[in-house]
Amino acid sequence: MRFYENPQKTSENREKPRSYYIPQGAAQYASLNGKWRFAYFPNSDLATEPKKWDEIYVPSCWQLKGYEDPNYTNINYPFACDMPYVPNINPMGMYEKDIVLSSKSKDFYLILEGVATCAAIYVNGEYVGFTQGSHLQAEFKISKQLKVGRNTIRICVYKWCAGSYLEDQDMFRYNGIFRDVYLLARPQNHITDFEITTEANKKIIVKTDKNAIIKLFDQDLLLEKKVGEVCEFTVKNPRLWTAETPYLYKVVIEYNGEIIEQMVGIRDIKVSPKYELLINGKPVTIKGVNHHDTMHGKGWCMSDEEMRRDVELIKSLNCNTIRTSHYPPHPKFLEYCNEYGIYVILECDMETHGFLRREPNVGYKYDMKKFAWPATNPDWEKEHVSRMERTYQRDKNQACVIMWSLGNESGYGTNFGKMIDYLKSVDSERLVHFESATSTAGISEEGLSKVDVVSQMYTSLGGIKKHMEEKTFDKPFMLCEFSHAMGNGPGDVWQYMDLVYKYPQYIGGCIWEWADHTVIVDGVAKYGGDFPGELTNDGNFCCDGLVFSDRSFKAGTYEVKSAYAPFRFKFEDNELKITNLFDFTAFDEYTIKYRIRVDDKCVEEKSLKLPIQPKQSISVITKTNPEKCHFGASIDLDLISPEGEVLATLSQPIECKNIKEKKNNTPAFIRDEDFFVYAKGDNFEYRFNKQLGNFDSMVVNGEELLNAPVKLSAFRAPIDNDRNRIRFWAKKNEWEGENLDVAFTNVRDVVVDGNSIVANCTLSGISRMPVFNYQTKVEIYSDGRISYTLDGKVREGAIWLPRLGYEFELNKDNQKFKYFANGPYENYCDMCHHVRQDWFESNCDSEYVNYPMPQEHGVHTNARSLCIENKIKFTAEEPFEFNVSKYSTHQLYKAMHTDEIGNSYATHVRIDYKNSGIGSNSCGPDLEPEFKLSEKEIFFQFDVKLA
């Protein structure tokens, strides 16, 4: 056994864990970030003194610097599951940097904030010690090894170690010194650690390991000064810290010339008799997101500015909670959460998910008895507890941390019980969270009794209702992961929040996850399986972010902003009822602005100041209640902060009677021939193909609009959330699917009567019996208008359809369009709370969404009118759905990356009866029945007009 394979000794000469701080005054801080000498060895056992050094920037991940290929894997270990042993041929990166010391009068410490996975430290050729725990701080005292003058620090980083079995998180697997590395020079008699606790009854208690001077400040105002190892401060009329009111006091500790500052938030955490989460005595709703450290082009490395920007963006989406999946973040990230107001569920660097797959043909069940897991193995107890201790000690003084999480997807065993025992011995306030103790894959009775929160992943809406109605648990219930945001989505976050607001015990959850993990190669986002060195991979499952890897937003991002909005409203019969969904903040200083729109006009607009208290509602009466419209009516409501920021805009359609458009009903001239029916007018000429059951030519003002015949279709390029059902829709194998991606229209007969053409048809996937028996009826009028009627039945027993509608493939020149529908972003029947019904202008380029794996996008629901380039218009008396794309469904379906789509050769217009919803089934539950296109009888009418 090599030294780094012993789970009972995962460090040597590492300092005891302590709270994070950077001392000032007599202490000196020296960042070692920057250029280091570097040598990469494919086999650490054969490493020699480098004859030639490369240069590498620290922090960085060596896979992104040309040493090894990146590797993305979710559950499977990238090596044999044979704990505690790792591959005999174990790569190593050797880092070296020189520093110059002018004096040795102080104590010197080398601190590594993050290094993967095992690091051995040498100073001037002398061994100092080693550490494991990639995302955990490691501190080494190096005073003895240093000398006055030039010194050489060497850090040997091993790719794998025993700790790798505890770090099987869903992410690209990187190595190197990926967080800050720095030196501290401190007085020889200095404070090592301190602890700050607060009570919402005004107290701040500071405990240190020295008899120190301790000062308490409110901003720059000194409130009180005391001396001692334990000092208690009472703050008069304190401003309490919450995610909505992130007010911070400052504690300054002075000892032997050193100055240590710590920002402090006064708050307490409890659970109510109703099993609500209470912050400062008030019930709090968790509106969260899971946050991995991942950065566009940099892997696990994030600068201070990038971390701050993430917190700002997350806060801007009305999120109030981050789960640090699945390890502690950089400590500065937590400081930003304190500052901006984000609750944190701080997770230990712990996941052993791969043990589910250590034997073939095993279902998704944590069988902790058949095989020894790290969680049940006594040899691993010390390392489990050590990782929890290091997590707690570093971040114990951060106000934002409201829960400690033991880790992720590791099963429950006695070693986790020991971790909980440790936490309970040092922290009596914060809650203990561990999804594996109460998982849908198996609940541990011991684990359930020890944790403070029942946490699950991706429980269905029905499952949550069942738990709440049957009172299954006597603890707060949350989803640490829900609404899987992969690709086009998520589509169900609004529905989950409906239940949060209904059931006090359901305290909320954290969306999976914040940002896509990708590696950019020649401008193209790459993912698992794209790199030759990957021995196992999980494809594009890493592209599951609420934002793209560069932090740009998608429709799902805006949907979450709306679902998490701190208000909701309902409009009915002139009554506008507004509900404040803040936990602590009244609307007194906020502005509520509403607009009532009818067609293309705003008929009423007003700004209001309403003193709505948290979780309370107030109704106002509007002057206008639209009764008639040509296209549609709606009411939009903005909530504007005192600083002028629009926190969210929500919209609600208003039901009103449609004013029917006057139509020219003069029949067009029709000529019926053997295989074609011709229609001609002053500025148009159409040809209906009897063999195809639809038009194959539409000439308007001398220009042929069609690039291909019009056709009925039911397939869509699968979104990531279709990944578990695509085999039932498409030809993925020989036996399961309806094969809708290779569909045939069989025309049984065509009847021409005056200006009416009726085609009786079937739609079938290749090798399959008809899935849809239907009739297309078109009526052609003298002004060029075509009235379409679709009337048909879906085969009994057939699966629900992804969509159903007509495809009009137009010439490529037809790029611009104007529409009255839900916009401006793409939207679907379940993901439509981020849009409003209005007139919008767009084009094919604007509609395209650059998902890392190309997929269905660009649908607009609740449509009444679509006009392409002032040439052709689609209208309907009842709402329809449409999509305008520069790419065909086939192009999007076959491409695995954006550079594989090919060139745009046409403008593809879909006029759809309906599309099934988005959901979050890429990892979450099946799409809710109400959002499935499961109707068996279909009737759909729309007009095609000359614009």
Q: What kind of region is each of these model predictions?
A:
Residues M1-R18, I22-P23, R37-N43, K65, ...:
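Accessory beta-strand-rich segments of carbohydrate-active enzymes
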Residues M1-Q24, V58, K65, T73, ...:
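Extended substrate-binding grooves/exosites of carbohydrate-active enzymes
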Residues E167-H190, E513, H517, V524-F571, ...:
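Catalytic cores of secreted or luminal carbohydrate-active enzymes
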Residues I121-V123, K202-K226, V251, E575-L610, ...:
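Beta-strand-rich binding/interaction modules
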Residues C61-L64, D69, N76-Y85, Q132-S134, ...:
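An acidic-aromatic loop/edge-strand motif
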Residues L64-G66, K159, T242, K628-F631, ...:
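Beta-strand/loop-rich accessory regions of lumenal/periplasmic or secreted enzymes
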Residues K144-R150, K207-P273, K628-N665, D672:
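Extended acidic/polar, glycine-enriched regions
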Residues Y95-K97, L136-F140, E229-F233, Q616-T622, ...:
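Short strand-edge motifs at loop-to-beta-strand transitions and within beta-strands
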